[in-house]
Amino acid sequence: MIEELRSKNIIQCGEFKLKSGDTSNIYINLKNIISYPDLHLKLCNEIANKIIPNIDLICGTPYGAVPFASYISITNNIPMIFLRKEQKDYGTNKLIEGEFIKGQKVILIEDVITTGNSVIEAAKKLEENGLIVSQIITVFSRSKDLNLMYNDISIEYLYHINDI
């Protein structure tokens, strides 16, 4: 999979500034996976194979993980919600799009993590709205900590930067 992602320039080498402010010689641009349905399908299936039983909803972090969550939602019949980066200030003023009931169990999908701060922030927003984050999976982890946690939940990953 790593070589396939490299061949499509989803994994790039060079000098890059990351969202965390760190610099890296490797950049993982999973937002471009939507242009390669075959690779997208493979990664979605890898994520789906890790989903624990009794999940009520799937949510992808904005915006990189939304295509993953959408595909998995449709193919695995798991209702999806969409977490906005910022709450709307018009219309319904929603932070979360899609139907949900407080107390439902959510799997949160992320594309790439470095510190884990973005996915933890997303998990907190879901919980503030009455949802229970039961599982967190990221496609790639850049974290130096191989055992990132949120509350008592291990942040699982398909691939680690060390695999590249």
Language-model features and meaning:
Residues 1-5, 123-164:
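PRPP-dependent phosphoribosyltransferase catalytic core
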Residues 101-132:
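A contiguous pocket-lining binding segment that forms or flanks enzyme active sites
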Residues 54-62, 138:
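Short glycine-rich phosphate-binding loop at a beta-alpha junction
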Residues 49, 70, 74, 124, ...:
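Short, well-ordered alpha-helices that flank and scaffold nucleotide-derived cofactor binding pockets
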Residues 1-53:
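Active-site-facing substrate-recognition patch
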Residues 58-59, 81, 134, 156:
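Structural detector of well-ordered beta-strand residues that form the stable sheet scaffold
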Residues 52-56, 101-103:
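Short helix-loop-beta connector
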Residues 68-107, 117:
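Short, glycine/charge-rich flexible loops or terminal/linker lids adjacent to PRPP-binding catalytic cores
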